[in-house]
Amino acid sequence: MPELIRKKKKMSSFEMIAFGFAGVILLGAIILMLPISSSAGVVTPFDKTLFTATSAVCVTGLVVVDTGSYWSAFGQAVILLLIQTGGLGVITVVASFSMVSGRKISLMQRSTMQDAISAPKVGGIVRLTKFILQGTFLIELIGAILMLPVFCRDYGWKGIWMSVFHSVSAFCNAGFDLFGIKEPFSSLTFYHSNIYLNIIIMLLIITGGIGFLVWGDIGTHKHRIRRYSLQSKVVLMTSAVLIVLPALYFFFFEYDHGTIHDRTIHSLFQSVTTLSLIHISEPTRHSLIS
């Protein structure tokens, strides 16, 4: 029997990551089922909560109920935690608790962390993880502070929560929003003319979207692009192409009104994010396909 136990196959890093994500999704779905999670105080069907939790952890932004009007503040907080966990990665979140508690991180845990964030080597993985956590929370905090003037003007004290939620959601590229409290599934249509807010959200999405390893290269080598890793160069070049080309299409074929400045910002915004400044039925069929 002891020999069988010794020969028992250990769970690989990828299995731990997969089971970790599945566990977080299932836990989130169960919590969202509770009456306290919905604004109406009712039990939400499991299929809806499972879809919402999966969408939040996988940061897809797809929803079956309007986030702002259907879920209570508690439910929205659960969704935000799921988004943050999905954006950082389950293993990174778990590792952060170990660091805060002062526990030593084993070699096996370091290897799992390496796989979780696709780091090139195990060496320096703890330092890289700290950089990721500090960078994430700092940028999200700055984003929330910059949004405060807009949302506190429109929502009062609730504007603080609106700022935090949308900063985290944008940085994690989640696509979730709370603007349904004005009109269900309205997204950013009520703020289509607020260029200041559009730019902040767009910059948060781009900053979060390029990835942790690119941050590391930028932080280490600054403007010396030649020293960037091949992965960072590919990510930056591909991101630029995928942002600029669709933006040019939107600019010339969709927006035939407004100033050049407004058209430029709106085109870039629609290229960067799935959040909508216009109702989805308004663009042409060609734009919806692109």
Put a short name on every predicted segment.
Residues 1-289:
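Membrane-proximal intracellular helices of multi-pass ion channels
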